[in-house]
């Protein structure tokens, strides 16, 4: 394999200046998703986007299955009687609920699920008898519905979240449930690592935790315009739901005890983050393991007399790669030029492109172009399979490396309000000294003009031995670093 030339990759100027406009352009032109459906916050997955989504879903399923989770499917309808049982939960979600306003004569009040804790608990109560039935680990990938009042954005803020993976686990003790919380964090790290996403892990402040949770841990990523996007959440629910639904088990000592529960969710926001993080002014680059098409072949011939020879060689290349499991496509359209095809497949994020022309056939080689860097390589047919596998691995590693470098460059510690404001304006995520007091935290948000992501869980969150003051409440000693950002 010989590097023919280094190329100048696309810039990210459009993403930095108007990310949402760029994202709409990508979804439309790459034929991933259609935003023209006439219901606010509800959109259509197109075939190419659906193939990408299925690959992500399969990744999620594989990792959950490997860690002892079992897939289920619950109804979309939840009786309001169930939904209203947990007081914090209903306060957190009631304004976002879609009601079933007409369903025949009479009948109970129903809602479309915004999340499934209150649907699952009544059934879990029937399934669990004693300690031998625990732990129970369930998950489903379904649509959930939330009547968003804020501006909706494709994949990012929706009324129908159509790829909502929610896991629900039930445990005998708090210790076992919190062990599951730690495992859930590791599960999400594995998923996001395979999506080549960089992430912060933050313990949400009390005023922003999941309704009904004792605490919430969130995964946030930083997008090119400096705003953060929440891509996954993990909730320790304690006995808040099992108490109101009377989910108990017979312990080994013969007494009945309340079970402890967790839940954790991920949605198509993760796909949005992947498309945007690896995006540029020419389109996006898909991680090779998840790309619907990993390699595209573009035949290049001049005149009808060259076509049979070129296509015969192309077919040989195609079979060679297909037979080792590589997802490959031949773009043999006659009404498009090779240059047009190059831009088209770069837009759609195909990781590798193979060009085959008459001179390549004479040398028994092909030209392979990486989407992430646009570098071109001459590869002999004899080394093609190994070279393609190697290049896909290199592309994946580079996407991951670039994402983490960008995230680390955008994280800054500051000790003054004005410095925090300036850093936020520059597209940074700031860490500021905080006492841990909720009122001071809310005031901090207002002073800086940004949202609190929470206390870092991927680094040491403590101030340590330094005598720092809470930026919003100077009379209080700071105990933690609090992350703040603008966010979607």
From Swiss-Prot:
Catalytic activity entry: tRNA(Pro) + L-proline + ATP = L-prolyl-tRNA(Pro) + AMP + diphosphate
SUPFAM superfamilies hit by this protein: C-terminal domain of ProRS, Class II aaRS ABD-related, Class II aaRS and biotin synthetases
Keyword RNA-binding attributed: no
GO biological process: prolyl-tRNA aminoacylation
InterPro entries: aa-tRNA-synt_IIb (IPR002314), aa-tRNA-synth_II (IPR006195), aa-tRNA-synth_II/BPL/LPL (IPR045864), Anticodon-bd (IPR004154), Anticodon-bd_dom_sf (IPR036621), Pro-tRNA-ligase_IIa (IPR002316), Pro-tRNA-ligase_IIa_arc-type (IPR004499), Pro-tRNA_ligase_II_C (IPR016061)
Enzyme Commission number(s) of this protein: 6.1.1.15
Compartments (UniProt record): Cytoplasm
A GO term, aspect molecular function: proline-tRNA ligase activity
Any Pfam family hit: ProRS-C_1
Ranges annotated as spanning the membrane: none
PROSITE patterns tied to this protein: AA_TRNA_LIGASE_II
Protein family according to the UniProt entry: Belongs to the class-II aminoacyl-tRNA synthetase family. ProS type 3 subfamily.
Entry domain remark: Consists of three domains: the N-terminal catalytic domain, the anticodon-binding domain and the C-terminal extension.
PANTHER family for this protein: BIFUNCTIONAL GLUTAMATE_PROLINE--TRNA LIGASE, PROLYL-TRNA SYNTHETASE
Name under which the protein is recorded: Proline--tRNA ligase
Source organism phylogeny: Archaea, Thermoproteota, Thermoprotei, Thermoproteales, Thermoproteaceae
Gene this chain is encoded by: proS
